[in-house]
Amino acid sequence: MKVISYNLNKHKAAGELDALVEQTGADILCLQEAVADELPDEISGLHLADSTARNRLGLALYYRRNTFTALQVRTLALKKSLHDRVLKPAEERMLAVRLRDIDHGRELIVASFHAAPLTALNALRRKQIAAALRELSSLGDGLPILMVGDYNYPVFKENLGQQVRAAGYELTLSDARTYTRYRVFRGHYDFATSVGFEIDDITTLPQGLSDHLPILVTART
């Protein structure tokens, strides 16, 4: 299974999505900072499962309909940062879809996630991530879960890694940094947390119009 996660930087990189899906053969596309009203129903054979409705810049998830059936969609509003309160509404920070693999008859959960920006403390982001992981576990007991997105967590990942492992998940970074705007804050912002998946690799794809670089997760259950 191939999953792309991409922060579109205020929808600026939306025009790149067809080519990204075609070039990578992605089965699932998870977006952050997307303008829901401007998203198409289909992107190179991937169907829009859902997008967040209340956010200024929201989340979306696309999947390949000849590979998966979408069974359930859930969004989650997380503890707000000052940034969220000033630039409201920006509350729905996770979008999860429960899918059935048509060929293998197995169910799994994939989620697009966007943590609070760098103006917030790492402690708040850790709380948001923990809440998202708990919600995902409640969506399907014992199912494989993959949450990808912009975690806005470039430094001190040891603390985050310990928390993620304590919750029963694994944290996996890509092979190269995913954010380039600020020299001081360059690093791995976009990565994956998972349980029940074997992550073969996570590749950082070439940069486009966004300040984030898309990542390609190759995983299997």
PLM region spans:
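Active-site-proximal segments of metal-dependent phosphoesterases and phosphodiesterases across multiple
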Residues: 114-132, 155-164
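Short glycine-/acidic-enriched loop or helix-start segments at secondary-structure transitions
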Residues: 14-15, 38-42, 46-48, 122, ...
